[in-house]
């Protein structure tokens, strides 16, 4: 560590009858074998080809033996169970029968409870090993029942819904259907290039705004969206009313004949116009005149309101400017008072100041990201009267030469209230300490003592609020040492500075601390 002068800041089965003990033993012996040979999902085949509450509705080859038929649904046993009276049923069928028809066997009406049913794994394995035909039309594949579901998932003859028209088609044909035959396949309009469904293309063609159409009057070919303007403004043979139709002329003619009509009927048109003007002059209190007067009165009222609103806006603007000036003065007063309070607090330190640096984890993260971290403490006084000082903490970057990942700590002199009454340059001893915040009886603080060097600029009377020259340690403490003890608590680092001027320097030496040798400052 070196002391340097620094430059500017950087439902199981419960009972069985005797007649079923042998069968139960046989079933349990077959359970392990069946669980290995079968597929776990085969017992609950997809409902796409059979109902969950009934047996297997598939075609067996050879045909299914009657001993494997459920007496209730008359299909192959699904999840076969056996009763104490020796009959076999689909598990779902017999449970539904017991709950709906009562606690009795459907075959012999013997008393039967649900907890008396036990799985017939022997029959289940036998049934799952039977050969069945694929139920999809056109597929000739045969397989064991246990493999039917897997086959169904990949069978090219299985029916799937077209994603466009929702109609079912066999899987091998669906792609051809989507591309060539589907009425909802997307096709491009030859005129506007818009994508439309094939079955809607005819309707789109009849309304496409860019389709070519022929004018019914002059046979000119235009695109559809231009046709309305063509009819209203350009078509030479479109029928239009006379310009004086409002005044009583009811003639209609082709647009290219309008000029001749106006020329030939000038006198009659003038008579119509004169009659219309004369009629208006005879009705001074007509609805139009009354409406105009109402509009004029409304406009006059609105103009008056507008003037009043303008006056109010001007008054409010003037008041706002006055208030803004007043608020600015209050803010300046508050800042002045805050500075005075801070100055008074700084004077109460009597040479011992503890600097609390919060959010220190954020500063460490910035240092790891190689962002410069330089923090200044508030000012504090060595006494009253006394010198005003502050501390500067600098987290050196990982790439810094000779001081990488170190905490640098410096002291700066500041302009204070008593500078004119104090001897300069500053002379005294400064103890810098990073406090151990652990709960241990004996705390191991990290501290250093340095003597002021009056010949350095760092201890001359400052000519600006804070002396840019500082004095302290470039390698005060390594960041690894900072993490080894509880120097950081609640994301806060505590730095203590104790200053003894030349009037009370003996106190530090009596405690046994001797200042370390220093390097010449810049």
Swiss-Prot record:
The MATH domain covers 350-499
Residues in TRAF-type zinc fingers = 150-202, 203-259
Q: Where in the cell is it found?
A: Cytoplasm; Cytoplasm, Cell cortex; Nucleus; Lipid droplet
Q: State the reactions this protein catalyses.
A: S-ubiquitinyl-[E2 ubiquitin-conjugating enzyme]-L-cysteine + [acceptor protein]-L-lysine = [E2 ubiquitin-conjugating enzyme]-L-cysteine + N(6)-ubiquitinyl-[acceptor protein]-L-lysine
Q: How is it modified after translation?
A: Sumoylated on Lys-124, Lys-142 and Lys-453 with SUMO1.
Q: Name one GO biological process term.
A: positive regulation of interleukin-2 production
The keyword Repeat belongs to this UniProt entry's keyword annotation: yes
Q: Which family does it belong to?
A: Belongs to the TNF receptor-associated factor family. A subfamily.
Q: What's written under domain?
A: The coiled coil domain mediates homo- and hetero-oligomerization. The MATH/TRAF domain binds to receptor cytoplasmic domains.
Question: Subunit structure of this entry?
Answer: Homotrimer. Homooligomer. N-terminal region is dimeric while C-terminal region is trimeric; maybe providing a mode of oligomerization. Upon IL1B treatment, forms a complex with PELI1, IRAK1, IRAK4 and MYD88; this complex recruits MAP3K7/TAK1, TAB1 and TAB2 to mediate NF-kappa-B activation. Direct binding of SMAD6 to PELI1 prevents the complex formation and hence negatively regulates IL1R-TLR signaling and eventually NF-kappa-B-mediated gene expression. Binds to TNFRSF5/CD40 and TNFRSF11A/RANK.
The protein, known as = TNF receptor-associated factor 6
**Species the sequence originates in:** Macaca mulatta (Rhesus macaque)
Lineage of producing organism = Eukaryota, Metazoa, Chordata, Craniata, Vertebrata
């Amino acid at each position: 560590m070196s002391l340097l002068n620094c430059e500017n800041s950087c439902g199981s089965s419960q009972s069985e009858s005797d007649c079923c003990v042998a069968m139960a033993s046989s079933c349990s012996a077959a359970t392990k074998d069946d669980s290995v040979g079968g597929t776990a999902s085969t017992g609950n085949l997809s409902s796409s080809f059979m109902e969950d509450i009934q047996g297997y509705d598939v075609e067996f080859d050879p045909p299914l033996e009657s001993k494997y038929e459920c007496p209730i649904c008359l299909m192959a046993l699904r999840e076969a169970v056996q009763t104490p009276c020796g009959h076999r049923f689909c598990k779902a069928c017999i449970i539904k029968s017991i709950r709906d028809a009562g606690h009795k066997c459907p075959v012999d009406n013997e008393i039967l409870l649900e907890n008396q049913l036990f799985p017939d794994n022997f029959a289940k394995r036998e049934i799952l090993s039977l050969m069945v035909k694929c139920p999809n039309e056109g597929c000739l594949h045969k397989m064991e029942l246990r493999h039917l579901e897997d086959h169904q998932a990949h069978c090219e003859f299985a029916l799937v819904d077209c994603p466009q028209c929702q109609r079912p088609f066999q899987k091998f044909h669906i792609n051809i259907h989507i591309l060539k035959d589907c009425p909802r396949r997307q096709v491009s309009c030859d005129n506007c290039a818009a994508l439309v469904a094939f079955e809607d293309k005819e309707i789109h063609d009849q309304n496409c705004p860019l389709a070519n159409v022929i004018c019914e009057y002059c046979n000119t070919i235009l695109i559809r969206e231009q046709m309305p303007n063509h009819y209203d403004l350009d078509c030479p043979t479109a029928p239009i009313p006379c310009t004086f139709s409002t005044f009583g002329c009811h003639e209609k003619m082709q647009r290219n004949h309008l000029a001749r009509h106006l020329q030939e009927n000038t006198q009659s048109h003038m008579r119509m116009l004169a009659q219309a003007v004369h009629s208006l002059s005879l009705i001074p209190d007509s609805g139009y005149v009354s409406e105009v007067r109402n509009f004029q009165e409304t406009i006059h009222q609105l103009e008056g309101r507008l003037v009043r609103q303008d006056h109010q806006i001007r008054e409010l603007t003037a008041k706002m400017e006055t208030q803004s000036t007043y608020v600015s003065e209050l803010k300046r007063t508050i800042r002045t008072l805050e500075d005075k309070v801070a100055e008074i607090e700084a004077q109460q330190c009597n040479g011992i100041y503890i600097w609390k640096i919060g959010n220190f984890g954020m500063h460490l993260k910035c240092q790891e990201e190689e962002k410069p971290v330089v923090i200044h403490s508030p000012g504090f006084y060595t006494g009253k009267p006394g010198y005003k000082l502050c501390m500067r903490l600098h987290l050196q970057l990982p790439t810094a030469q000779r001081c990488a990942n170190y905490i640098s700590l410096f002291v700066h002199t500041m302009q204070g209230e008593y500078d004119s009454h104090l001897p300069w340059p500053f002379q005294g001893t400064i103890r810098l300490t990073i406090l151990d915040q652990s709960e241990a009886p004996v705390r191991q603080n990290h501290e250093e003592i340095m003597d002021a060097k009056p010949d350095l600029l760092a201890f001359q009377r400052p000519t600006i609020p804070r002396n840019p020259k500082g004095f302290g340690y470039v390698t005060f403490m390594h960041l690894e040492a900072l993490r080894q003890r509880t120097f950081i608590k609640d994301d806060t680092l505590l730095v203590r500075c104790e200053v003894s001027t030349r009037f009370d320097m003996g106190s530090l030496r009596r405690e046994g601390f001797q200042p370390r040798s220093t390097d010449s400052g810049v």
